[in-house]
């Protein structure tokens, strides 16, 4: 019993930071089906950028070679090779609001994209916004730092999700208070 107590103390005495050896961008290349975003072990949230959402290539909604971010979704499947989740796309924006399907997307330089376990950040050049993401086991936290306070907004897209083809989605703004949509 005493030997077990000594051995268990040594196992928990290791204060090394092993996260510095983790590169969340590994596996993000074409058809890797992994994402670089923030998540926690056994957590329900995997918040990450979306660079595409149509076709098998985008099962995790992120491909490293892309240069356009559609927004940030709150849950992903990592490395599965199948499409699901990718719910609640959120995107900070500036300028005139639009109903255009792709009007809120933004380019980003790879030199200003950073990820470590539990944290992701990127600078969106079109929107002129720094986006930072982190996660708890049940909640995603987003922080947006705008270069200018003029015409800032946050788009929340409840319809977004990965799809085999773009015909799987349909939505129609019937009025300012009524949205009709379906996903197959």
Name each region found by the language model.
Residues 13-180:
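Accessory carbohydrate-recognition regions in carbohydrate-active enzymes
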């Amino acid at each position: 019993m005493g030997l077990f107590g000594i051995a268990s103390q040594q196992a928990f005495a290791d204060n090394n930071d092993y996260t510095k050896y983790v590169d969340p961008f590994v596996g993000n290349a074409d058809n890797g089906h992994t994402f670089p975003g923030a998540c926690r072990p056994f957590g329900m949230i995997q918040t990450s950028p979306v660079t595409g959402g149509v076709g098998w290539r985008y099962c995790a909604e992120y491909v490293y070679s892309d240069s356009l971010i559609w927004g940030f979704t709150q849950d992903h499947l990592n490395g599965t090779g199948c499409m699901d989740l990718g719910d609640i796309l959120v995107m900070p924006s500036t300028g005139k609001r639009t109903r255009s399907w792709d009007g809120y997307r933004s380019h980003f330089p790879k030199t200003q994209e950073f990820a470590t376990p539990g944290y992701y950040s990127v600078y969106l050049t079109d929107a002129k916004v720094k986006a930072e993401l982190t996660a708890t086991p049940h909640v995603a936290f987003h922080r947006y730092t705008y270069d200018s306070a003029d015409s800032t907004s946050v788009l929340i897209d409840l319809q977004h999700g990965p799809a085999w083809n773009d015909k799987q989605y349909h939505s129609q703004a019937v009025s300012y208070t009524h949205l009709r949509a379906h996903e197959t």
